[in-house]
Curated annotation (Swiss-Prot):
Biased composition (Basic residues): 570-584
Top-level lineage group: Eukaryota
Zn finger region (UBZ4-type): 516-545
Biological process per Gene Ontology, one example term: DNA replication
Described function: DNA polymerase specifically involved in DNA repair. Plays an important role in translesion synthesis, where the normal high-fidelity DNA polymerases cannot proceed and DNA synthesis stalls. Depending on the context, it inserts the correct base, but causes frequent base transitions, transversions and frameshifts. Lacks 3'-5' proofreading exonuclease activity. Forms a Schiff base with 5'-deoxyribose phosphate at abasic sites, but does not have lyase activity.
GO molecular function: damaged DNA binding; DNA-directed DNA polymerase activity; zinc ion binding
Catalyzed reactions per annotation: DNA(n) + a 2'-deoxyribonucleoside 5'-triphosphate = DNA(n+1) + diphosphate
Entries under Pfam families matching the protein: IMS, IMS_C, IMS_HHH
Major enzyme class: transferase
Gene: polk-1
Name of the protein: DNA polymerase kappa
Amino acid sequence: MLTFNDNKAGMNGLDKEKITKVIEENTSASYSSFSKKQQSRIEEKVLEIKNRLQTATREERQKSEILMENLEMKLESSRDLSRDCVCIDMDAYFAAVEMRDNPALRTVPMAVGSSAMLSTSNYLARRFGVRAGMPGFISNKLCPSLTIVPGNYPKYTKVSRQFSQIFMEYDSDVGMMSLDEAFIDLTDYVASNTEKKTFKRHRFGGDCPCWLPRFDENENTLEDLKIEESICPKCEKSRKIYYDHVEFGTGREEAVREIRFRVEQLTGLTCSAGIASNFMLAKICSDLNKPNGQYVLENDKNAIMEFLKDLPIRKVGGIGRVCEAQLKAMDIQTVGDMNLKKNLYPLCFTPLSQESFLRTALGLPGRPSESDPRRKSISVERTFSPTSDFNILLEEHQEICRMLEEDVRKSGIVGGKTVTLKLKLSSFDVLTRSLTPSDVVKSLEDIQKFSLELLEKEKGKEIRLLGVRLSQLIFEEDEKKRSKTITEFWNEKKLQIQNLQGSENVDDDDVIMMDTRPCPICGTDVENRLDVMNCHVDECILKVQNDDGPELICVSVENKSTQKPERPSTKKRKLQEKRPKAKKMVTIDSFWKKSG
């Protein structure tokens, strides 16, 4: 049974049964078969959970209760109510960009994508049940007047970079979760921002529909409102620009209003926001007052628990159709239910799932990660009409590899250690095949070579989606920090020597003979070469013997001491530097680094 998911802004109050029926009637037999198999697996898991709860003994339930009580105490000790976390989510982003650039799309139901798949839809289309992730041909059945526009992802990326620069002014470590969503920690900004701010505002009106944001003709005229009239260079109709000023106060709510205002002024696009003590809650809140609104959840435990009490579990990020079915098997419908029935988790779920569900029930963020927070992989995939024609698959494969290599270059990534091929068959079953070559996969040729090797093993299969992924990534910044090779080390030393020789301001106390060791007989610094040192020692021994001096113990210089040579005094060093046979010189620090 296919079910329609209406847990998205702008889709409240829809007739789910009617929409589900239309989807089922227009779904291919292959996908229906796949969906039934998937549903069968879910039902097996649900039955397993119900049986486990029925057979759990009293002792098991008591043990489970104690376990969750201890875990709750541990998690509560980590609750942090001091942060001002914000989730900014652009409103119907891809669709909004297209409507901004084409005024004719603003008053009709429209979506971005193709007949195969939609990326997003505007709010008018959502009233018909049209949403992201839905095939375009089914969307046309739900909304015959739907206009589908091909995606222009370079344009969406460019606009995203524009408003992300605004976010960085408030939090230099802003987390861009996607092109249209950002996590901003306003804590430091709010603490330091103690004065009101005033910004100049512009809005557009007149016969010209080209420009956003629009001026509301019903708005009460403000005292400082100024109007500038001109002819639009796009449509050549009369255009009015209304100028005035907007003031923003202090505090996190005002800061978020300020951010949203600046984004709209810069791009003509609106965004919504959620404000809370952590990003998990902020993301939930960002969906509540869409479009073009914001929701604030007080930094108070009681307020948080009250907020979560009646919240449907599907509103929480990470809880999808499968997880929802498993929780409903325990009669859990809301996040409040998750808290009431937390003692059942150890009976049915793994320790990681137990902690994850309890964190959600308590309104706490996910487990902190000690691993590298940067992306773990980068991939490109495409959906197309099912085919087993290998020539067609090769064309798709080459284009996907080209796009992936381009994304790798733009993302500051050197390459990856593992190549993965993803295939979705005409039956909708998904296959993944991976390969880890001996060398890092960096170039387009490497990506094509290794992924093609995997693809050739799947010849004859009817495929509807093809993707290539690089994982175990190596970043450019890592390459810069890596240990230097011996060659690089000596090249750098040579450069230091050249720079030092060309300098006239070298302190005598800061230089010594380069690449020398003291003679074990006379203490003189001698070039650190075995033949030179042996020759010098022989000369010293002969000289001492000819001078009728005391008998000396010959020290073998072939077996180098593991200790650092005794450094001659500063006075002796200066004398040595004045000798005509003095060699090149480097700094003392560089010498000891090399000798140590």
